[in-house]
Amino acid sequence: MPSPVATVETDSLQQPILGSRRPSNYFWAIAVSVGGTGFLLAGLSSYLQVNLLPFSEPTRLAFLPQGLVMGLYGIAAILLASYLWFVISLDVGGGYNAFDRKTQKATIFRWGFPGKNRRVEITYPLSDIQAVRVDIKEGLNPKRALYLKVKGRGDVPLTRVGQPLPLTELESQGAELARFLAVPLEGL
């Protein structure tokens, strides 16, 4: 994740948030696309008795049940890959956190799925922000996240979903944001 961009001249801080365009999502979309295409071509090869895969001999497979099952697995994988590529192209979950002293506003923006909630934008006055909270839970399913404590509302998550941030990066982002907003940093 890129580091936050703070400028003293404009009195603003902007933190980009990586959404579904993570390297792991690209890896899985490519792997499922290639695997699904291979399975579908193997199933079609066994049905048509024409070798559609140059590196193997799927025409030797009996269509029932092996060829049929491989074709169905291929179709399922291609549908899953299509969903992954769709989500990546929309950058679901991506966006930014922007804090501006001139306008006295904090803006949390994320991209969603198509529909009425495609653009999720939440704006708070800076005066309503009470603290920046760091949430760290270690163990089998670790959780490391930054939250804004906003007066009269619940905690607002600021970090991306997915792979937890390294502790040093989480601490430095939290400290920089708390210093910029002149609020306490809680949870460390």
From Swiss-Prot:
This is Photosystem I assembly protein Ycf4. Keywords: Membrane, Photosynthesis, Thylakoid, Transmembrane, Transmembrane helix. It comes from Synechococcus sp. (strain ATCC 27144 / PCC 6301 / SAUG 1402/1) (Anacystis nidulans). It is a multi-pass membrane protein. Belongs to the Ycf4 family. GO terms for biological process: photosynthesis. InterPro entries: PSI_Ycf4_assembly. GO terms for cellular component: photosystem I; plasma membrane-derived thylakoid membrane. The lineage of its organism: Bacteria, Bacillati, Cyanobacteriota, Cyanophyceae, Synechococcales. It is found in: Cellular thylakoid membrane. The chain crosses the membrane at residues 26-46, 68-88. Seems to be required for the assembly of the photosystem I complex. Pfam families: Ycf4. Signal peptide: none annotated. The keyword Membrane applies. It comes from the Bacteria.
